């Protein structure tokens, strides 16, 4: 059976059998045209046959795909680059290829982490990279220092107890994010900034609105975990990136609009390289974002008697915020307030402390899920088995000794009613005795206490009026409540106190 092969402008006939596979035909074409093919760690160069617009697989036979006498097949030489490295994400359980040139192996771990952040959307401060042997890779070293070769699979590990939280952020699940927030104050603030960063990168509107309401700001740097707050010299440069930069890199137009409406300072927020959001969207060729940011930057802010260009308005606002920050810092310095790490806080130092970036789950990290706790009531048979008295306050508290709660056994109903009547009679006697004592003191000492005469002298100075509108109401309400609970007016109480004092 004769078929024709079209290759690079030539049209050559080939005699083949209908039972031949596509792979055999490719070998015939390679030998006829002397095409050099190769395959190594960096990539491969191979042939591809197409018939009726579809690519043919090597295992297919010609008859199975309907190739008959005088059919024409197109042949192409294709080159495919293999990933330089692979990164296994412990959060998503996916393996991410890193398609860069071989020169990447001569660069530092810091450069690789910058590329990984642009691909996965995680801030550089929430994860670390490890070699296949589990050795943590530090930013200051090169990839060759860890014997990293082409095709090596590295592992991305996050903070212990953060897997579920970060997965909720990557999926935009607000309830899951709220469920796995930390109970430590500084860590909680850091998690909210991380959530806003990931939401901005992925374009989740609902999660973005929640993070903004929680106090996270789009022009505020994500920063580092509080455990690494003292490792300033070893920090990655991208820890100063803000959520507005993540939205600009990903081309999330709706998020950019929300951030600019929240604060116009986002327009002039710069990253570690000194790039504004407008520069970043230019670099990544996001046309819609470029047009929006340009229109905002060249707009004006109108006041009752003046209109100010947006750039000037941002400068004024930045100057005011710096002045407020300086004044606040000065007042706090005079008050001797101390910020930062305190005694007992966890501090991590590279190479010395036990690593806390091993991607442990929430429960394995020692956290307790309040939503999964189920309280069990003791059985009724055990409640009536003992006659020991039990403190009623202890019923609402968990029993750490795992003992069943025990109550008084039920008594006879007639004896219980008699006991209740006896208690009521005693209470009445006590109340009557107290009232007799009060009357005795009142009748005995009231005539002996002289009251000051009422002054009717007029003064020339104006009367004093209390400015609070509700002052009269507060005084009357306090007097009425005092009379209700004590049974005496404030005037009678004052006389009583003077009499007792004498």
From Swiss-Prot:
Pfam families (UniProt xref): Ank_4
- Taxonomy, superkingdom: Eukaryota
Instruction: Give the protein's recorded name.
Output: Protein ANKUB1
